[in-house]
Design a protein with these regions (language model features):
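Eukaryotic N-terminal low-complexity, Ser/Thr- and Lys/Arg-rich leader segments
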Residues: 1-11
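Short aromatic/hydrophobic contact patches that present stacked aromatics
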Residues: 108-110, 141-143, 178
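Conserved GNAT acetyl-CoA-binding A-motif
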Residues: 132-143
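Conserved glycine-rich acetyl-CoA-binding loop
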Residues: 112-126, 145-153, 157
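Structural motif
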Residues: 135, 157-158
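C-terminal "cap" of GNAT-fold acetyltransferases
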Residues: 5-7, 145-149, 158, 165-184
Length: 184
């Protein structure tokens, strides 16, 4: 797992970390609810979030909350996991790795309503890119809505380039750009 890091913004403490498929089940529900609002049918979904954390990677920014005494272990499906109610979801990125182990695909990047425009996705994206490069990934790909100017700006700033327009990628008239980062 990647090493967690923390930062402070407006007197709040935020942590960037990789999710654990056994210990972070409560956050799975938050991610699915959030992504359903943001991406609709394109969200990671309740059946896919756990395999993403187990066989891919899911990184989050969480806001650390004040009442730490509410941490407790909870039994679920004969597995014990930590119910971390001392944090709330801020941003999330899901990643898949290709069969060619030098390629990774960023499935989703999003920030919870109320936290947009504060730099959380930018910090998380930088953390994830550093992590991928340390894993000897040489190509990172993602798709983005053709009209999503904020996301395109973030990705271009990180070194991504638009490779092609994918017409009807997610259905009729739902076009996306394929963007790629290639290690130099």
């Amino acid at each position: 797992m990647g090493e967690a890091c923390s930062y402070t913004l407006n007197s709040n403490v935020f942590q960037i970390r990789e999710l654990n498929y056994k210990k972070d089940m409560r956050l799975f529900d938050e991610i699915v609810e959030h992504e359903n609002r943001v991406f609709g049918e394109g969200s990671v979904g309740k059946w896919n979030i756990k395999p993403f954390t187990k066989y891919g990677k899911v990184f989050v920014v969480v806001k650390k909350l004040k009442n730490l005494e509410n941490n407790r272990e909870v039994e679920c499906n004969n597995s014990t996991y930590e119910n971390k109610i001392d944090e709330e979801l801020v941003s999330v990125i899901e990643i898949l790795r290709g069969f060619d182990y030098k390629i990774a695909y960023i499935y989703g990047v999003s920030t919870v309503t109320g936290y947009e425009g504060q730099g959380h996705a930018t910090r998380l994206f930088g953390y994830v890119m550093d992590y991928l490069l340390k894993q000897d990934i040489s190509i990172v790909e993602l798709t983005v809505g053709v009209n999503n100017e904020a996301a395109k700006k973030l990705y271009k700033k990180a070194g991504f380039a638009i490779m092609e327009k994918l017409e009807n990628e997610y259905g009729k008239n739902i076009d996306r750009y394929l963007m790629r980062y290639t290690r130099k």
